């Protein structure tokens, strides 16, 4: 299994417009972050996790001008714009009348259908993406024969989902994990987890909180994602982390 970090930034991305802090003015491209998303390849099948407003540019960075394969499915973690704002750009994957399957909880599916209703109408305008919504619950399901295990997370007071595929778990935007969900996170080779910044935040984990989760879950390796410009410079933060914890960056590919 291969995972590519398409984006590792928070809702505003890095750099922020109008900001002159050391991160936003950094010349290190690892400090430049699109909105958080990931592309997973399993046995030649592609699964996208979240589809934010930077999706088109992320695809250009990933595939350049090379042909790309079909998407087996898109897993949605929650309804916030930085995670679903690029769904219309899935139209490139819908040529030749191909359907892209979306997977989301009922309340998330409803929110998406309200925001882009033209995508789900029976008689679509020519050229709009051909998306099919699949409502899921907090129970395992399959995407093109690949087992997906949802993980209940709390984004402040908002219930959202993380996902486990094989021995990799992708947990973004969480503040807490319900105690009963930890059994789903045993035996991980790789944990991907949000670490917004050092300072306390009401709906996202801080760096220290993410490190505490890593200690509790005990993956072989862990990667931080969904980082703001106040997270700090990539290289400086990496030096302060345990040897099995890494600051992810856009374009990083890992193998599990």
Feature locations, PLM:
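Active-site-proximal loop/helix segments of hydrolase catalytic cores
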Residues: 154-161, 165-194
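Binuclear metal-ion centers of metallo-dependent hydrolases, dominated by the metallo-beta-lactamase
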Residues: 178-256
């Amino acid at each position: 299994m291969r995972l590519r970090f398409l984006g590792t930034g928070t809702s505003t991305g890095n750099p922020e417009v109008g900001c002159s802090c050391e991160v936003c003015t950094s010349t290190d491209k690892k400090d430049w972050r699109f909105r958080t998303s990931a592309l997973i390849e399993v046995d030649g099948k592609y699964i996208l996790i979240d589809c934010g407003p930077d999706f088109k540019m992320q695809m250009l960075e990933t595939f350049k001008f090379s042909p790309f394969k079909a998407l087996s499915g898109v897993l949605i973690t929650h309804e916030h714009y930085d995670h679903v704002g690029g769904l219309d750009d899935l139209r490139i994957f819908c040529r030749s009348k191909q359907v892209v399957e979306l997977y989301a909880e009922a309340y998330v599916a409803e929110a998406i259908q309200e925001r882009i209703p033209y995508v789900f109408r029976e008689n679509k305008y020519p050229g709009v993406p051909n998306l099919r919504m699949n409502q899921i619950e907090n129970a395992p399901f399959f995407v093109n024969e690949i087992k997906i295990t949802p993980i209940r997370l709390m984004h402040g007071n908002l219930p959202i989902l993380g996902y486990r595929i094989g021995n990799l778990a992708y947990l973004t935007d969480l503040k807490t994990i319900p105690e009963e969900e930890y059994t789903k996170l045993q035996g991980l080779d790789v944990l991907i987890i949000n670490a917004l910044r050092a300072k306390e935040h009401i709906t996202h984990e801080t760096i220290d909180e993410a490190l505490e989760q890593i200690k509790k879950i005990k993956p072989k390796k862990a990667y931080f994602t969904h980082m703001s410009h106040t997270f700090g410079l990539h290289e400086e933060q990496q030096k302060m982390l345990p040897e099995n914890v890494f600051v992810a960056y856009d374009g990083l590919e890992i193998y599990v």
